[in-house]
Amino acid sequence: MSLIKPFSGIRPKEKFAKQVTSPNISYIDNYKPNKKLNFLNLLNATEINKSKKILKSLRNKNIIQEDKSNHFYLYRITYSKKKLLGIVGKINLDNYDDKKILGHEETFVERIKKRKEQLLKFNSQISPIYTTYKSKTNSLKKLNHIFKYKPDYNFKSEDKCRHELWVVKNANTEKLLKNYLKNIKKIYICDGHHRIQAMLKTKKKIAPMIVAFPDNQVNILDYNLSLIHISEPTRPY
């Protein structure tokens, strides 16, 4: 039994993909508010009801649309000549309880409450949980033939990263991917711990959307906070 399942995603039409995609966090300062189609408008909305209106507007104008059947999605991002290949699908939260989906980060009650409130009011997950899994070297080569086909999306964002996405519709390719996914025994959460905890605390049966990258493609970088100023003197211990 595979931990990652297909689902019907809500996604932009190809011609709007670059405009809708929100910028990398490092480039948010360069974001121009007049980009009305950008998803960052929805993410930055001060009220949940405003976010819901923006999402509804994008759907009504056919900027974004929901797939009519369940699919896997393959996402490739290229930057500085490095390529990362992610598998986008949904997971069952029961696998969190049985330790097949593992976190590593401390979570905070207030942030979980806020995420839960957003989830219940908005009734949508607007970005995937970022995860990784242990992969045998070069095991993804079995999927190489997929990348001979034209991707459904292919564009370069403001941060110079190239984004490509394939919607897996071919039955043979889907079967091959399902066989590959059977070898993934555990999934590790990289980013999205508070969202997962919020989903666990709702009474709704939620299957979170994730993107899973193999560990041999992921770089683990230090994240250090620096103390540069103390406003008041402190006593020695």
What do these predicted regions represent?
Residues 166-207:
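Active-site beta-strand/loop microenvironment that shapes enzyme catalytic pockets
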Residues 98, 140-141, 197-200, 219-222:
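Short helix/loop capping segments that flank catalytic or ligand/cofactor-binding pockets
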Residues 147-151, 204-209:
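A short alpha->loop->secondary-structure connector
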Residues 1-150:
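N-terminal extension/subdomain marker
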Residues 228-237:
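Single conserved hydrophobic/aromatic residue that forms the stacking wall/gate
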Residues 101-107, 164-168, 186-187, 226:
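Flexible, glycine/proline-enriched loop segments at strand-loop-helix junctions
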Residues 209-227:
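Class I SAM-dependent methyltransferase SAM-binding "motif I" and its flanking Rossmann-like core
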Residues 149-171:
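Glycine-rich phosphate-binding "P-loop"
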